[in-house]
Amino acid sequence: MINMQRAGSGRIAGIATALGGALSNQLGAASGSLAFPGMGPLGVVAVRQLVAAMILLPVVRPRIRDLTRAQWWPVLLLALVFGIMNLTLYLAVERVGLGLAVTLEFCGPLAVALLSTRTRNGAICAAIAAAGVMAITRPQPTTDYLGVGLGLIAACSWAAYILLNRTIGSRIPGVEGTATATGISAVLFLPIGVWILITTRPDMFALLCAVGAGVLASTVPFVADLIALRKIPAHLFGILMSINPVLAAFIGAILLHEELGTIEWVGIALIVAANTAALLLPSGTPRDATAGAGQRRD
């Protein structure tokens, strides 16, 4: 009975953490978009990675010398994914628009949700969530195949981000793995950040917006997602990520005074219904439920 109560409370905490990370991510995305005119997408991504590393490394102080080969490889891959995931999404938005870019990117967590669940309920919830995302974003057809390709790379990166975080969470205690990956990613982007600061000379407003994006869209979600994926299975996390377009729509309506039409509200209702069903309906034993169970040290 005690173990069941602990599992239930852990699941609730994981869901709340994932949703909190998603909210922070969308607030950070809004902040980062305000910096685009001053330093461009590449500059914003570089500053985001640098800010996240400047916060996490001194606080966490990861013991990198103690990491084994089995711990190092997912950390190194995650460091690459951090930058690729954000940069390709921003570049896709520039070429094909926000709606199509976000829809393409959501294919990543959707694939994780579909491939890591063995039940019909999980697959149906994922499909409903996908329909809701399309209703909100309303992607338009395009012949910009490079933009589509960038969106699909962002999708693959998001899927890899989920799976790598789950692996790191089972092999490295605390948030040392995330902090280490963030530091490596920052080193990779440091020359780019310096070059952009010298050549574009962004104003203070753009810098502050980029720094805000680094805190809200990188530091907080990176840690929150790692913690959440220790408490909930990857297929549920993938479905929960469909809440991102909903949060983006609400933030746009509140902060940017954007209007939500009937189709957008239908999309929001579909996503809320899919997430509610995923949380309440029995989902059986997902493929990832026992992954790494014998390796966890924390």
Regions found by a protein language model. Name each.
Residues 1-43, 80, 84-88, 131, ...:
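Glycine-/small-residue-enriched transmembrane alpha-helix faces in small-molecule transporters
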Residues 77, 107, 121-140, 251, ...:
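Hydrophobic transmembrane alpha-helices of multi-pass small-molecule transport proteins
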Residues 19-27, 31, 59, 76-91, ...:
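Hydrophobic alpha-helical transmembrane segments of multi-pass membrane transport proteins
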Residues 10-14, 38-42, 46, 67-72, ...:
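Juxtamembrane helix-entry segments on the extracytoplasmic side of multipass membrane proteins
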Residues 14, 31, 37-84, 107-112, ...:
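Transmembrane alpha-helices of multi-pass small-molecule transport proteins
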Residues 1-20, 52-77, 118-123, 141-142, ...:
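Membrane-interface interhelical linkers
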Residues 43-53, 82, 90-118, 154, ...:
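Specific alpha-helical transmembrane segments that line the substrate/conduction pathway
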Residues 2-7, 242-298:
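C-terminal-most transmembrane helix of multi-pass membrane proteins
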